[in-house]
């Protein structure tokens, strides 16, 4: 019951605290092209994460599950939206269902709604190989997300305090998993050092989960008597984390998430090097406040606007969008300079 109550608390406080929008994309500007030699009607948006082919560079990221009927209904609606738009979708952490079988229905519902969809299972970095296998089987997953959430756990009143052995556990899961493993942050971003460590143990896909969206330190602080306010502004902004990712020069696929709300955010994330982008808090707010049809319409508009932007830039495919010139300014440029990451190739390609 404690875990289920926490799941419901997370939904409530995620909606009430909102998204910070401190993702850093305001520091990224495209170089205008007056002769793009492109046509809106021929723009294609297919992309890949590793060996997984996706019809869109937008997918529905992990949100919830394991909180009884309310979370079942949310996942049911999200699965419908994913089916309508042929989007990939991740479920929230399944540890609740591994510990309490009665909660499994709130995750399994997605396959009932969308039998042929692409779904990602989800567990924390404390998971064992056996738990990872059960989570994948529970939803017939095409991939497994392992989330890293140190700051959230430290801020959580009942959270973990021991993070030793995490890389070794991830390596064991990667070696034994029958589906691709995606390691993701939950809103605090990833450094190039972390990504290099993950690549060294065989991880091939990373969701950078940057600062700028739902702030889980702020969410957990709402649940505390004594706030750990120093964690509320902790992390690496989404735009910065994408560039840190691409600077590693590893053969990794990258998912950009963290405050992404617009087609321009999507285009900038991909142009910086992401293979796809993920929405969570923004979609949840629309669903909860305006309903499922409004969310369906919003995703239609996102795809339309993304194709407009790609047409303006002369990028006929997602791969071409990854090579358009752009300029990095402001705090993002300052951070990257201090970190020894050269940005000139973005503006001169």
From Swiss-Prot:
Protein family per UniProt: Belongs to the IPP isomerase type 2 family.
Record-listed Mg(2+) binding positions: 153
BP GO terms, sorted: isoprenoid biosynthetic process
Lineage: Bacteria, Bacillati, Bacillota, Bacilli, Bacillales
Keywords (A to Z) from UniProt: Cytoplasm, Flavoprotein, FMN, Isomerase, Isoprene biosynthesis, Magnesium, Metal-binding, NADP
InterPro entries: Aldolase_TIM, FMN-dep_DH, IPdP_isomerase
Biological source species: Bacillus anthracis
Chain sites annotated for binding substrate: 6-7, 152
Subunit structure: Homooctamer. Dimer of tetramers.
UniProt GO MF annotations: FMN binding; isopentenyl-diphosphate delta-isomerase activity; magnesium ion binding; NADPH binding; oxidoreductase activity
Catalysis performed (reactions): isopentenyl diphosphate = dimethylallyl diphosphate
Keyword Secreted: no
Cofactor requirements of the protein: FMN; NADPH; Mg(2+)
Listed name of the protein: Isopentenyl-diphosphate delta-isomerase
Location of this chain's protein in the cell: Cytoplasm
CDD domains from the UniProt entry: IDI-2_FMN
Major localisation: cytoplasm
Function: Involved in the biosynthesis of isoprenoids. Catalyzes the 1,3-allylic rearrangement of the homoallylic substrate isopentenyl (IPP) to its allylic isomer, dimethylallyl diphosphate (DMAPP).
List of residues binding FMN: 62-64, 93, 122, 184, 214, 258-259, 280-281
Enzyme Commission number: 5.3.3.2
One Gene Ontology term, aspect cellular component: cytoplasm
Gene: fni
Pfam families, sorted: FMN_dh (PF01070)
């Amino acid at each position: 019951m404690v875990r289920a109550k926490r799941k419901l608390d997370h939904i409530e406080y995620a909606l009430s605290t909102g998204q910070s929008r401190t993702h850093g994309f305001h520091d990224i500007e495209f170089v205008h092209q007056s002769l793009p030699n492109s046509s809106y009607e021929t723009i294609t948006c297919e992309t890949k994460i590793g060996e997984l082919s996706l019809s869109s560079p937008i997918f529905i990221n992990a949100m919830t599950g394991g909180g009884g009927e309310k979370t079942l209904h949310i996942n049911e609606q999200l699965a419908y939206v994913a089916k309508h738009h042929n989007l990939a979708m991740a479920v929230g952490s399944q540890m609740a269902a591994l510990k309490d079988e009665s909660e499994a229905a709130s995750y399994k519902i997605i396959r009932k709604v969308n039998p042929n969809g692409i779904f990602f299972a989800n567990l924390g970095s404390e998971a064992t190989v056996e738990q990872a296998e059960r989570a994948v089987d529970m939803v017939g997953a095409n991939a497994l997300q392992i989330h890293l959430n140190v700051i959230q756990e430290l801020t959580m009143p009942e959270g973990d305090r021991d993070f030793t052995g995490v890389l070794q556990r991830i390596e064991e899961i990667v070696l034994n998993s029958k589906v691709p493993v995606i390691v993701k942050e939950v809103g605090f971003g990833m450094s190039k050092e972390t990504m290099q460590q993950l690549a060294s143990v065989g991880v091939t896909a990373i969701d950078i989960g940057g600062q700028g969206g739902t702030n889980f330190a702020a969410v957990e602080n709402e649940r505390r008597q004594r706030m750990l306010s120093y964690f509320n502004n902790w992390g690496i902004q989404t735009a910065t984390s994408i560039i840190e990712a691409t600077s590693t020069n590893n053969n990794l696929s990258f998912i950009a998430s963290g405050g992404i709300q617009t087609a321009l955010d999507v285009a900038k994330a991909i142009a910086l090097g992401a293979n796809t982008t993920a929405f969570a808090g923004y979609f949840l707010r629309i669903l909860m406040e305006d309903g499922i049809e409004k969310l369906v319409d919003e995703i239609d508009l996102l795809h339309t606007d993304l194709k407009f932007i790609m047409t303006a830039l002369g990028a006929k495919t997602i791969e071409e969008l990854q090579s358009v010139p752009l300029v990095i300014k402001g705090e993002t440029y300052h951070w990257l300079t201090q970190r020894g990451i050269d940005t000139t190739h973005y503006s001169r390609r």
